[in-house]
Structures are given as structure tokens and as C-alpha cells.
């Protein structure tokens, strides 16, 4: 059972680290109409939200991995039920928040790629920001995959919670 609990946490940690790293390196410089500008991930609130949640998930998953490997989850400062309940609540919260951040960033990427008829021009094509847009989309995809792993961890911690006697 321990391996089953560890695998999704490893997946969540690795993919959130990849999503964070790719998004943090997303930026592109363009020249046009006599001026030079740089587009960075930090210009988009949705991408900032995505980075913040992926960093939080990476730290949380890494701490959970260390505690699972060292079997310190039944520590003396808390009852097993309270500990498992806390893990379940954190897993649920992070799963919803990461899925929300990934959805927001996917919307920003979609608007950048295709625009919105008569309102928002397709930034990727208009300013030829192909590298920026491709890296942002890759980071969003990794974040969605990471959310799949934290959702799996949440399901497993819910199952574990149902097996621990309430005290």
C-alpha cells in the first residue's frame, strides 16, 4: 500500500517541478514598429497563479514523500486520524486549486493562440511569439497532468481516511 501512496506523489512532485520550470523560463523578445518588447510569463496573472500553485504543490508533495518514505505519518504530536484527515484536506484543497490554476492558464494560452473574434487578436500569430506560446502550453499540459496525480493522491488519502478509526 505504501508504494501505491508514494507513486502519485512522485508524479505530482516531478510534473509540478517541470511545469514550474518551463513556465518560469517562458519569455520572448520581439522587435517591431521601431520598438522592442519582451513578453514574460509574469505579464499574465493566470500564469503567475499557475507558477504559485505548482511551487506549493512541489513543496507539499516532496514533504509528503519524505514523510511517507520515513514512515513519520503517525507522529506523536497528532493522532493517526487527525493526521490522515489533515493530509486528505490538503490533498483536496491542492487538487482543486491546481486544477483551477491550470484551467485559468489554459484559457490565457488559448486566447494568446487564437484570440477572441473582434476583441482580442491572436498574440502568438500577430507578434510571432511561437516559442513563448509553445512553452506556456507545455507548462499548462504538465500542470494538468500534475493535477491528475494530486487528484489520485486525494482519492487514496480519502480511502486511507476511511480505514483509520476515528478517535
UniProtKB/Swiss-Prot annotation:
Where found?
A: Cell membrane
Write down any Gene Ontology CC term.
plasma membrane
Q: Where do transmembrane segments lie in this chain?
A: 3-23, 49-69, 81-101, 138-158
Keywords recorded for this protein, A-Z: Cell membrane, Membrane, Transmembrane, Transmembrane helix
Q: How does it sit in the membrane?
A: Multi-pass membrane protein
Chief location of this protein within or outside the cell:
membrane
For whether the record's keyword set contains Membrane, the answer is: yes
List the Extracellular topological domains.
Answer: 24-48, 102-137
Task: Tell me any Pfam family this protein matches.
Answer: CASP_dom
Q: Which InterPro entries match?
A: CASP/CASPL, CASP_dom
Quaternary structure and interacting proteins, as annotated? Homodimer and heterodimers.
Q: Which family does it belong to?
A: Belongs to the Casparian strip membrane proteins (CASP) family.
State the protein's name. Answer: CASP-like protein 3
Q: Give the species.
A: Osmunda lancea
Amino acid at each position: 500500500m505504501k508504494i501505491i501512496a508514494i507513486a502519485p506523489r512522485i508524479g505530482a512532485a516531478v510534473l509540478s517541478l517541470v511545469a514550474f520550470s518551463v513556465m518560469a523560463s517562458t519569455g520572448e523578445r520581439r522587435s517591431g514598429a521601431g520598438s522592442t518588447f519582451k513578453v514574460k510569463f509574469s505579464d499574465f496573472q493566470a500564469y503567475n497563479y499557475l507558477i504559485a500553485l505548482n511551487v506549493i504543490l512541489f513543496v507539499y508533495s516532496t514533504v509528503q514523500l519524505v514523510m511517507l518514505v520515513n514512515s513519520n505519518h503517525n507522529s506523536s504530536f497528532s493522532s493517526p486520524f487527525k493526521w490522515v484527515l489533515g493530509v486528505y484536506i490538503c490533498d483536496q484543497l491542492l487538487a482543486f486549486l491546481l486544477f483551477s490554476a491550470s484551467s485559468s492558464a489554459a484559457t490565457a494560452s488559448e486566447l494568446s493562440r487564437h484570440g477572441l473574434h473582434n476583441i482580442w487578436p491572436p498574440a502568438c500569430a500577430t507578434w510571432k511569439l511561437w516559442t513563448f506560446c509553445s512553452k506556456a502550453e507545455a507548462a499548462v499540459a504538465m500542470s494538468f497532468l500534475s493535477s491528475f496525480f494530486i487528484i489520485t493522491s486525494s482519492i487514496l488519502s480519502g480511502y486511507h481516511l476511511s480505514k483509520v478509526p476515528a478517535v
